[in-house]
Amino acid sequence: MIFVGETMERANHSLVRLRREGEELTLDEKAEICSELELQQKYVDIASNIIGDLSSLPMVGKIVGTIAAAAMTVTHVASGRLDIEQTLLGCSDLPFDQIKEVLEKRFNEVDRKLESHSAALEEITKLVEKSISAVEKTRKQMNKRFDEVMKSIQDAKVSPIVSKINNFARYFDTEKERIRGLKLNDYILKLEEPNGILLHFKESRTPKDDSLQAPLFSIIQEGYAVPKSIDDESAFKVLYALLYGTQTYISVMFFLLEQYSFLANHYYEKGDLEKYDEYFNSLNNVFLDFKSSLVGTGTSNNEGLIDKVLQVLMTFKNSEFLGLGKNGVDEMLNEKINLFNKIKEEIESKQRMTMSETPENFAQISFDKDITTPIGDWRDGREVRYAVQYASETLFSKIGHWSDPVSVREKACPTLRMPVDQTRRNVLVFRKFDNSKPQLVGEITPYLSNFIDIDRDLYNAASNPDSAVGFKEFTKLNYDGANIRATFDQGRTIFHAVAKSGNDKILFGLTFLVKSTELNQPDKKGYTPIHVAADSGNAGIVNLLIQRGVSINSKTYHFLQTPLHLAAQRGFVNTFQRLMESSEININERDKDGFTPLHYAVRGGERILEAFMNQIGIDVNAKSNKGLTPFHLAIIKNDWQVASTLLRNKKVDINAVDENNMTALHYAAILGYLETTKQLINLKEINANVVSSPGLLSALHYAILYKHDDVASFLLRSSNVNVNLKALGGITPLHLAVMQGRKQVLSLMFNIGVNIEQQTDEKYTPLHLAAMSKYPELIQILLDQDSNFEAKTNSGATPLHLATFKGKSQAALILLNNEVNWRDTDENGQMPIHGAATTGLLDVAQAIISIDATVLDIEDKNSDTPLNLAAQNSHIDAVKYFIDQGADINTRNKNGHAPLLAFSKKGNLDMVKYLFDKNANVYIADNNGMNFFYYAVRNGHLNIIKYAMSEKDKFEWSNIDNNRRDECPKEECAISHFAVCDAVQFDKIEIVKFFIGTLGNFNICGPLHQAARYGHLHIVKYLVEEEVLSVDGSKTDTPLCYASENGHLAVVQYLVSNGAKVNHDCANGMTAIDKAITKNHLQVVQFLAANGVDFRRKNSRGATPFLTAVAENAFDIAEYLIREKRQDININEQNVDKETALHLAVYYKNLQMIKLLVKYGIDVTIRNAYDKTVLDIATDAKFSNIVKYLKKNSGKFRREYKSSYGEHSFLQTNEISRFIDGKSIEHDHPQFINADNESSQLFSGTASKIDVIGTLLLIDVLIRYFSKQGYISKESDSASDGITQAAALSITEKFEDVLNSLPNKSAKEQVDLADVHGKVYAALKSGRNSQIHQILCSSLKSISTLKPEDMEKLVSVIMNSHSSLSMPEATDSANEAYGETLHLFGESCRHSEDYISQKFSTNPFSFESEKKIQKISI
């Protein structure tokens, strides 16, 4: 992990490096440092930002482009205020030469990539560029953190392996960057070095010790990258290294493909087909080798690296401890899995980079055409050879061997005969005369066997600069059948060739043979013949093409240039005039970056500009996308003649601004063009004081910033230049001159009377800036001008303050020699002596104390003395000097920090010894009670600990320490207690081993408990396995309690696997699972649940784990227990206050929990000790949303509960296996369900509309009574709550079935099923079984359509249908009473409950006499 403290330490180190006087840093070094200081606006990615802008100047060219790019840096420097701190530290002092070097490298790279690719390499190039961008994007992001991962890996086994990955990746990046900027010849030499980088990178896939493959597979095979728990920090870091290394491995493959593709293409363009074949072959071999190692061969026993990495990622993703994506890791895993799957798919989809087969040359050559020599390249005595190459849509073979030479004798353009390719591939044919450059002469399509070598000669004739010869040869070849539509290099046709050569005779003849659309055919880069003619200055060809109606404004593919753009940049006036004769021409047409042809004409020169300026409709102030006008470009090009030509048009705006509000004058000043600057200043309309945006920098500011003293001096002397103009932040040219050390400019400023006390917005004067700068000699120059050395900034700092706090020793001494005030304090109450102590300027401190020793122990507002500041910043010489001078060695600031604490924290044993010898107070502590010993423990400095314990006459760790009394409130604790606790808490295992293993302090602090609390598994293992401590410990809270409470799953797993008791009491009457639940650690709960937890055990609050989960609002845990542990919990259980989980959920207004509980069937009618249902509580508390939900959903819970639990699986337990779920009448007598059934016609006229099902339900209750198909068995005196709940639920569900079957669909809504269930449950639970039929009957009566007088008729029918009903154990008296009871049952739905009670009281089988009837129940 990367900690804030480490980041700050790096930043401080960077400041020190920047502040060192006289040390020059490279661009990359300075960029890195400024980035660490978070000052990256000026340097981080500055080169790439500039390159991004370069695309806006495609017409300027390489050399001028470099200059223009330098100008574009202004937009990045001026993108915000010029920060004084950054500027003086060097983060704004642009190293212009270094930037140009970076640009030159990038230009060289771009030039190489712009070279044309052979058709065979185009697809490969696309694949490489597409894939490498995806890999490199994330790899570069990972690269930034990999150093931190490296530093933090301490595992002795893993560290060397990861180090190999790091070393290889660094070497790869360095070499790749080093060669990218080489010029073409140097680049090729570097790539072709024997045993060079290409060979080394190819071997990265071998198992050699210094390869990349070896450490990656070692990590995978040893399982180092699979975390064992969410706390397995080491495995996380190794996983990071594995992913970074694998992406580097993939990048190496694509880098090699890119380089071999480049080399193959280079030699193809040169015509060296042997070299082309060599690298083309290497290209394929590299791909196949790496493909095999990355994705395997497709067999199960030969998986590739990507497959193995994906397995690691999936193992991690599917691990139990990761949970449901709630640890912030899931997103990263998915991202990496998707990336590697995408790369794998991309690689697997490409079987090969080239065809495996090298074509044989079966060509038989015969000269059948009557074409005599000499013509074209055909000359008697020359030797001609042919070679072929197979081509499919995306794959190409190598070029085969050259045929035997054939001598040319009198005839040209032979016929080549070869067999038809059986696989139907195209065949490319190459030709070479003697040792000249080979040429592609044509392509044989499938099914053809004859090829006449004549089309290339026609193309060459059209390309011949000798028009007469070319026309003659073209005429002959055309007559003999050459194809005028054949295409060759880069998709160019004969029309392109003619346009380039300017042979108007050929073109004139062609115009009669082809359509005008063919004259518009673009090549692969979008150049049409008129583009080529314009770019070549062939005005006659342009004129012919215009007459044939070609598109005059067509654009190239990349830069979107029109023919007019190309003619303009070449300066072809006649061509320009021919183009302008077209009525369709758009003179202000813009290219990709917004440049018009007039912009391009700046490069074309004075004559073409004059031609433009005379045109009607020309926009002389047209702006590019970046806001540059042609006048801007003329000044950037430093071509005053061109600028003067533009100025002849009075409409030219010389003060036009670009997107950064910069005028041409700004650019002249930036680039140091003195003569151009003079010309501009002398223009009457010039505004010399325009400022850029948002930096508000004028031309004078920029001239000084870029150190062009001659330009700056000229501008200072100019009357129309404001020399005191303030940029953003109040920075004037004078301030900049000091910051940049421009002595000549400063001298001139003094001479012209510039105010030397100018202040920035923060009240920095030039003297303040000189004191902080790397130009200390300027201080004396300013003092000689009577500069105020006591001036203060907004923070109260004098120049001497700034010199000392910025570490500028020479500047501080100069100021002291001029008797400045060394006792002035700033807003922090600090004097210059504090600054000298902070930055370690010993000579300055000595100079101040030699003048005034009273400052030795003076405190600032934080109570820091010079000694304390020197100690905190590890300036050892200064510390010793201050102590020797009598400084208080035990000085403490407001936070209690003291010198001894500072050096102990940083692990400086020598200084700790020194302070011991100087009798420092070894028990001194800061405001947090931390003494030197604790700091040594927490930071892992075992050497200091051992030294301190050896100095028993000075330090005794058994002493009571009251500074940390609040951490040990019940007893007096010694230093040893806190030290051992700290060692365990801060994961310092070597110190733990020393304290416990070496010194034998097993009982101090309860180390095993502490290790479990903080999740330090390796310390837990050490204590259990090596020191044999009991896994259950000796305290009330066991180690398992601590680990569970803090969610350390790996520790919990280890302790349980080693015998820890999962149901052991913790503090407060809780167990480990209670502790885990209170902190919502689902994974720990799941593990404990699977390892013997007693879910019925109640804690001191009378709550089981389930009630605890609800009380703690641990929704995921509650849901898990209900869903996965329903066999072990009772959803309706109550605590000591008779509150169910639903009561608790309502108390906490947890609607999500309420919905969960209702969904799974909790009883909403249960009352607590205060006789309140959940609805009562919600209503009283005015929880309107909960009340609304409970009222709406309380009747639906049983159906959902049943669907969730199946057919009441809980009824299958041994406890309730005696329950008999009897069949209902509904199932035994389907004739009563369907009103259309024949049997149901018995009721026609009388009961056609009655609710038969409702009555059947009531009869079912009665029949169960007499047949003993009871809802609850009475074998035991009292049914368990679970059985009673099941019976009540079953009865209520059957009643719900009745309601669902009624024709009146609103019937269900009219009955409160929750109320029905509650009453039934209460009746069964209390033994008042007689009330059940009354409850059901009463509920049904309000919605029944049954006429009372028809009830007995219906009962009699039901009676008959039950004739076969068996009542095996019913007594005779019970059977005898059956008929009368049916009648009474009907009466019970007609009369009051009093009537029913009266009737039943006289019945021999009344429920008052229920006890007489054994084993009969409702």
From Swiss-Prot:
Residues 1-20 form the signal peptide. One of its GO terms (biological process) is exocytosis. Gene3D superfamilies: Ankyrin repeat-containing domain. Transmembrane segments: none annotated. Residues 1200-1418 form a propeptide. Expressed in venom gland, cephalothorax, and abdomen tissues from both males and females. Pfam families: Ank_2 (PF12796), Ank_4 (PF13637). One of its GO terms (cellular component) is membrane. GO terms for molecular function: toxin activity. InterPro entries: Ankyrin_rpt, Ankyrin_rpt-contain_sf. Residues 1026-1032 are annotated as: 4C4.1 epitope. ANK repeats lie at residues 458-489, 490-521, 525-554, 559-589, 593-622, 626-656, 660-690, 695-723, 729-758, 762-791, 795-824, 828-857, 862-891, 895-924, 928-957, 971-1003, 1004-1033, 1035-1064, 1068-1097, 1101-1131, 1137-1166, 1170-1199. Residues 238-257 are annotated as: Helix H8 is the probable transmembrane region of the tetrameric pore inserted in the target cell membrane. Belongs to the cationic peptide 01 (latrotoxin) family. 03 (alpha-latrotoxin) subfamily. Is the main neurotoxin responsible for the human envenomation syndrome known as latrodectism that results from bites by Latrodectus species. The H8 helix is predicted to insert into membranes and form pores by assembling into tetramers. The helix is contained within a helical bundle domain that undergoes significant conformational changes during pore formation to allow exposure of the H8 transmembrane helix and transition of the toxin from a soluble monomer to a transmembrane tetramer. This is Alpha-latrotoxin-Lhe1a. It comes from Latrodectus hesperus (Western black widow spider).
